[in-house]
């Protein structure tokens, strides 16, 4: 199954958080916080403005993005947990 987001929505896959502290202690899944970084897998056409024009998306497929802890709606697709969120929920793009 493939998901194509509409309008100003994006599909993001969370990046795995570091499961080990600097001193070597392994953090169990139940104790760790959900990562707030992800990779954009798909983007919609853009936000429809009040005048009917479409503002293009600022993010693109492959971008590494930062988002809030509670951003987006979680969906399962072929065993993967993905987030569907509005572009405005993205706080920034991580540049290498």
UniProtKB/Swiss-Prot annotation:
One of its GO terms (cellular component) is cytoplasm. The keyword Cytoplasm applies. Keywords: Chaperone, Cytoplasm. PROSITE patterns: CHAPERONINS_CPN10. Coiled coil: none annotated. GO terms for molecular function: ATP binding; metal ion binding; protein folding chaperone; protein-folding chaperone binding; unfolded protein binding. Signal peptide: none annotated. It is found in: Cytoplasm. Its main location: cytoplasm. SMART domains: Cpn10. One of its GO terms (biological process) is chaperone cofactor-dependent protein refolding. Belongs to the GroES chaperonin family. Heptamer of 7 subunits arranged in a ring. Interacts with the chaperonin GroEL. NCBIfam families: PRK00364.1-2, PRK00364.1-5, PRK00364.2-2, PRK00364.2-4, PRK00364.2-5. PANTHER family: 10 KDA HEAT SHOCK PROTEIN (PTHR10772), CO-CHAPERONIN GROES (PTHR10772:SF58). HAMAP family: CH10. Together with the chaperonin GroEL, plays an essential role in assisting protein folding. The GroEL-GroES system forms a nano-cage that allows encapsulation of the non-native substrate proteins and provides a physical environment optimized to promote and accelerate protein folding. GroES binds to the apical surface of the GroEL ring, thereby capping the opening of the GroEL channel. This is Co-chaperonin GroES.
